[in-house]
A protein has these predicted regions:
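Helix-loop-strand module that forms the ligand-binding subsite of alpha/beta enzymes
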Residues: 1-32
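Glycine-rich phosphate/pyrophosphate-binding loop and the adjoining helix
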Residues: 34-88
Length: 88
């Protein structure tokens, strides 16, 4: 319990699977894995990466790093809080 989760979602359409991600956020919370506030949606995934998985736009590296930095921050914060005990 009390370990953070992060949601990456994708779709072939313009919304990047965010509707499914919102449902997953509720499920993860019930499992004791609160999700970080940010999600990383990948809209039009067929255009976002080439066949080798290389991002078509250099901005994906920046987005990914910021997303993982946030996950790491929450992991460290929740680890420190767990050392003090759980809320129940």
């Amino acid at each position: 319990f009390w370990r953070p989760s992060a949601i990456v979602c994708y779709s072939a359409g313009p919304f990047g699977g965010v509707r499914a991600a919102m449902h997953l956020r509720a499920v993860l919370g019930e499992l004791g894995m609160p999700s970080i506030p940010s999600i990383l949606p990948v809209p039009k995934v067929q255009d976002a990466f080439d066949d080798a998985g290389v991002p078509a736009d250099a901005a994906w590296e920046r987005r990914g790093k910021r997303f993982l930095d946030e996950l790491e921050w929450y992991a460290q914060a929740l680890a420190a809080a767990r050392r003090g005990g759980t809320p129940y």
